[in-house]
A protein has these predicted regions:
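C-terminal catalytic "cap/lid" subdomain
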Residues: 1-258
């Protein structure tokens, strides 16, 4: 199964735009990006003589309405706004954050994922040896209200849901693609060192030492730990798209094991 981030178009500045709830934006992103990935993968597989179905699953993920993230939103999203527009958003009860020299942007909660609503559909397709694109952009965050699912004004960390999906499917391996070929110790410093292998215990020690930045490598390491604690026989590979072919052959990337 594959997971992708939300489309960058949702983050650009639009002078004339149609407002839509966050949950609808997430659904639009899944369809938009999933459509492109699905057709590109299908064409590539056929070019290689492989006849394998590729499907995009519109995926909802339940969250806890009392998750502390709703009380301290941290995820910056959406268009840049003027101070006047930002004040209007605040009056609506929304959170905003100023980006000096650029303007203001919405800030929403990033609650922890609880359950993947469409997990059985994903599992069935994967078991049938089909390529599945699911949980795009982290999934559509929803809150359970009796038998109904109500969209939440939030986003789910894509790395967190990747770890959740991998453990729910008992995958043998979780591959997380990022912008760097390895996980690094002392990243960006003179003594920066690439880490070829890590254990869960070592990863936890590095987190405690403040080695991984929030919003960049930290959520990837946390997702790896979450997955491996549920699937101890599995492994996690973290690398960049440019190095993924070598990484699969064991020539690049950071491998994390239990």
């Amino acid at each position: 199964s594959m997971i992708h981030k939300a489309m960058t178009e949702l983050r650009r500045v639009y002078i004339d735009y149609t407002p839509a709830p966050m949950c609808v934006c997430s659904a639009m992103s899944q369809g938009y990006v999933g459509y492109d990935i699905q057709n590109s993968l299908r064409a590539e597989l056929l070019d290689r003589g492989i006849s394998k179905p590729v499907s995009t699953i519109l995926t909802q993920v339940t969250v806890d309405p009392y998750d502390e993230a709703f009380y301290e939103p941290t995820k910056v999203i959406g268009r840049y706004m003027s101070k006047e527009d930002a004040e209007i958003e605040v009056k609506k009860g929304n959170y905003v954050k100023e980006d000096p020299g650029k303007g203001f942007r919405r800030v929403v909660a990033a609650p922890k994922p609880i359950d993947i609503v469409e997990i059985e559909a994903i599992r069935t397709l994967a078991a049938a040896d089909q390529v599945v694109i699911a949980c795009g952009g982290g999934g559509i965050p929803v809150i359970e209200q009796k038998h109904a699912l109500k969209g939440a004004s939030a986003v789910i960390e894509k790395d967190a849901i990747a770890g959740k999906l991998a453990s729910d499917l008992s995958c043998d391996e979780l591959i997380i693609l990022t912008t760097v070929p390895y996980v690094y110790k002392n990243f960006g410093k003179e003594d920066q060192a690439a880490l070829e292998t890590l254990t869960v215990a070592e990863a936890k020690d590095l987190i405690a030492a403040g080695q991984f930045e929030e919003g960049t490598m930290l959520p990837k390491i946390e997702a790896a730990i979450s997955y491996l604690e549920k699937v101890p026989a599995g492994k996690v590979l973290i690398t960049s798209m440019d190095h993924v072919k070598d990484a699969i052959k064991g020539k690049a990337g950071t491998v994390i094991t239990a």
